[in-house]
């Protein structure tokens, strides 16, 4: 059974262009650096609650597949990023199987390590785009990232306790 925050994350609807929003809100939504690091800058101890890690078929990641290479399997990781034990962010990472070679194979073994701790230590990380999304009162974003030119999708939903609000 899926966590309610993941249901909300999948319900995000994305803006075609960056909306006119308060600068503080945009600062969070368009952050290029690690969200883990940003939460730690708020003086919090960051931890991961792992909800799901598994290979899945394209039908389970249909929205992300539209922005990734078509493959038969994708590595799916769904988490809650918590600050002092309180969920601040729901995250969903979709990685094409072809991305999981060489150093990027480590993406399968993150366990309770925040994704940002891995991604933002890589000198090969690039970001193709950030799209801002909203579902009811909650804000989120998604990005296509590349490690050594190999793509993955990261979707993040800011939960009500997050300092974004």
Swiss-Prot record:
Chain sites annotated for binding substrate: 35, 77, 115, 156
GO molecular function, one term: chorismate lyase activity
Class of enzymatic activity (EC top level): lyase
Catalyzed reactions per annotation: chorismate = 4-hydroxybenzoate + pyruvate
A biological process term (GO) from this entry: pyruvate biosynthetic process
Subcellular location: Cytoplasm
Transmembrane helix in keyword set: no
Annotated metabolic or biological route of this protein: Cofactor biosynthesis; ubiquinone biosynthesis
Enzyme Commission number(s) of this protein: 4.1.3.40
Main location: cytoplasm
Assigned GO CC terms: cytosol
InterPro entries with a match to the protein in the record: Chorismate--pyruvate_lyase, Chorismate_lyase_/UTRA_dom_sf
Keywords of the record: Cytoplasm, Lyase, Pyruvate, Ubiquinone biosynthesis
Keyword Cytoplasm: yes
HAMAP family assigned: UbiC (MF_01632)
Family per similarity comment: Belongs to the UbiC family.
Job description of the protein: Removes the pyruvyl group from chorismate, with concomitant aromatization of the ring, to provide 4-hydroxybenzoate (4HB) for the ubiquinone pathway.
Subunit record text: Monomer.
Protein name from the UniProt record: Chorismate pyruvate-lyase
Species per Swiss-Prot/TrEMBL record: Citrobacter koseri (strain ATCC BAA-895 / CDC 4225-83 / SGSC4696)
Lineage: Bacteria, Pseudomonadati, Pseudomonadota, Gammaproteobacteria, Enterobacterales
């Amino acid at each position: 059974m899926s966590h309610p925050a993941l249901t909300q994350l999948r319900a995000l609807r994305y803006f075609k262009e960056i909306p006119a929003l308060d600068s503080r809100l945009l600062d969070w939504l368009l952050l290029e650096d690690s969200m883990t690091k940003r939460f730690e800058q708020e003086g919090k101890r960051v931890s991961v609650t792992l909800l799901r890690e598994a290979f899945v078929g394209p039908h389970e990641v249909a929205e992300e597949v539209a922005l990734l290479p078509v493959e038969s399997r994708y590595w799916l990781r769904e988490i809650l990023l918590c600050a002092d034990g309180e969920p601040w962010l729901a995250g969903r990472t979709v990685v094409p199987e072809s991305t999981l070679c060489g150093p990027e194979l480590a993406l399968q073994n993150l366990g309770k390590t925040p994704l940002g701790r891995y991604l933002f230590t890589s000198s090969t990380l690039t970001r193709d785009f950030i799209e801002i999304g909203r579902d009811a009162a909650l804000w989120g974003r998604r990005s296509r990232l590349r490690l050594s030119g190999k793509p993955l999708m990261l979707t993040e939903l800011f939960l009500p306790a997050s300092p974004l609000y």
